[in-house]
Amino acid sequence: MSIEKQVAEQLLEIKAVFLKPNEPFTWASGIKSPIYCDNRLTLGFPKVRQFIAKSLAEKIKENFGEVDVVAGTATAGIPHAAWVSDLLDLPMVYVRSKAKEHGKGNQIEGPLTKGQKVVVIEDLISTGGSSLKAVEALEEAGAEVLGIAAIFTYGLDKGKKLLEESNTKLVTLTNYDELIEVALNKNYVTTEDMATLKEWKKNPEVWGK
């Protein structure tokens, strides 16, 4: 079984991903969605989080072999970045969404030297906006960002466009299309639900309005 399918299956099993085509969730961005992904739940399942860390480490070795530092995004990316940096025997930093308003006022915590090559660890990619803020902060600090490694992506056109425009490479363990196929095969959703799930991805901003 592929990594994509294995991770999708695990996320469904531990209920890190909820699929409710008939009772959509509302994201913080206001988008109505038949899916909600909370990868923080992986923290409570040692076998799942270990598999995710090992798989992310392998992806990084394959795609970003020159990496010097692993950077987690606050807060959900931090634990995964810690486990991955351990496996790769690399330093780790983490990046806040904005600089602290007290203390040293740091946006990046941990030692980072100009010119170091960094890979950003994310738990989830939706529109890509928050991930790119982390990339920008690292670049402003003088780092060279090789790319982003994430557990899951919705694969939305808006996110793809933002990443392409910023010339940021993204590698993920699994994705929306793979996950809904696994969900159908494992009877988490019906064939009718699948039509709704596929329709949402075509135009999430207007779906459900």
UniProtKB/Swiss-Prot annotation:
Top-level enzyme category: transferase
E.C. no: 2.4.2.10
InterPro entries the record matches: OPRT, Or_phspho_trans_dom, PRibTrfase_dom, PRTase-like
CDD domains referenced in this protein's UniProt entry, alphabetically: PRTases_typeI
Keywords: Glycosyltransferase, Magnesium, Pyrimidine biosynthesis, Transferase
Residues annotated as binding 5-phospho-alpha-D-ribose 1-diphosphate: R96, K100, H102, E122, D123, L124, I125, S126, T127, G128, G129, S130
Protein family membership: Belongs to the purine/pyrimidine phosphoribosyltransferase family. PyrE subfamily.
Protein function: Catalyzes the transfer of a ribosyl phosphate group from 5-phosphoribose 1-diphosphate to orotate, leading to the formation of orotidine monophosphate (OMP).
This protein's name: Orotate phosphoribosyltransferase
